Amino acid sequence: MSEERIPLIGERFPEMEVITTQGRIKLPDDYKGRWFVLFSHPGDFTPVCTTEFYSFAKKYEEFKKLNTELIGLSVDSNISHIEWIMWIEKNLKVEIPFPIIADPMGNVAKRLGMIHAQSSTATVRAVFVVDDKGVVRLILYYPMEIGRNIDEILRAIRALQLVDKAGVVTPANWPNNELIGDKVINPAPRTIKDAKMRLGQPFDWWFTYKEVKTT
């Protein structure tokens, strides 16, 4: 993979050493065996970003149950991050238990494609989900004006981990799909023999589903 190209889904997350509010971190190696969500925000001490950090903090234990860590990032300084965290903890009564990367020169943000035309001096709301092998599994970009749906990020991680475990694919709005509820879809058959074995199953040989345990 080119050193300058933005990492894509299915590729290894690029190796880098970053400075955070919890010290230096080597990505992705320091999270080997764990998933992590790296998310960028436009700036400290801004209303939408504050609501996002509050929500991430409130949902932190749900991420932990999925063997997943959180890492924030913006082009603010480490001092700014620390002051903002202290303000959140004092005024909103919630602890920020995860590190925030300080990237004042924007090197990490540029490497990960977090600087868009909307602003050349701040990051958009990007999300990278990286699995326990250091592979990028999901990339999301939100404009600055729209706060992220933290429950959707959790849903996507649950779906990805189920896909890995059970060898299935998940339908729209899983686990609340309008057609099959919390069931999952079997991958497409690879041979004519496999296709014929599925004849008569709902909905058809190319679209079959089943129940799986999610725990």
From Swiss-Prot:
Broadest EC class assigned to this enzyme: oxidoreductase
Matching HAMAP family: Peroxiredoxin
GO biological process: cell redox homeostasis
Note: The active site is a conserved redox-active cysteine residue, the peroxidatic cysteine (C(P)), which makes the nucleophilic attack on the peroxide substrate. The peroxide oxidizes the C(P)-SH to cysteine sulfenic acid (C(P)-SOH), which then reacts with another cysteine residue, the resolving cysteine (C(R)), to form a disulfide bridge. The disulfide is subsequently reduced by an appropriate electron donor to complete the catalytic cycle. In this 1-Cys peroxiredoxin, no C(R) is present and C(P) instead forms a disulfide with a cysteine from another protein or with a small thiol molecule.
Main location: cytoplasm
Active site: C49 (cysteine sulfenic acid (-soh) intermediate)
Similarity annotation: Belongs to the peroxiredoxin family. Prx6 subfamily.
Entry's localization field: Cytoplasm
InterPro entries given in the database record: AhpC/TSA, Peroxiredoxin, Peroxiredoxin_AhpC-typ, Peroxiredoxin_C, Peroxiredoxin_TDXH, PRX_1cys, Thioredoxin-like_sf, Thioredoxin_domain
GO cellular component: cytosol
Domain of life: Archaea
Name the UniProt record assigns to this protein: Peroxiredoxin
GO MF, any single term: peroxidase activity
Subunit structure: Homodecamer. Pentamer of dimers that assemble into a ring structure.
PROSITE patterns named among the record's database cross-references: THIOREDOXIN_2 (PS51352)
Lineage of the species this protein comes from: Archaea, Thermoproteota, Thermoprotei, Sulfolobales, Sulfolobaceae
Keyword Cytoplasm: yes
Residues annotated for substrate binding in this entry: R125
Chain ranges of the Thioredoxin domain: 7-162
EC number: 1.11.1.24
Keyword Cytoplasm assigned: yes
Coiled coil (residue ranges): none
Sorted UniProt keywords: Antioxidant, Cytoplasm, Oxidoreductase, Peroxidase, Redox-active center
Cited function: Thiol-specific peroxidase that catalyzes the reduction of hydrogen peroxide and organic hydroperoxides to water and alcohols, respectively. Plays a role in cell protection against oxidative stress by detoxifying peroxides.
NCBIfam families, per the entry: PRK13189.1 (NF009668), PRK13191.1 (NF009670)
Organism: Saccharolobus solfataricus (strain ATCC 35092 / DSM 1617 / JCM 11322 / P2) (Sulfolobus solfataricus)
Catalytic activity: a hydroperoxide + [thioredoxin]-dithiol = an alcohol + [thioredoxin]-disulfide + H2O
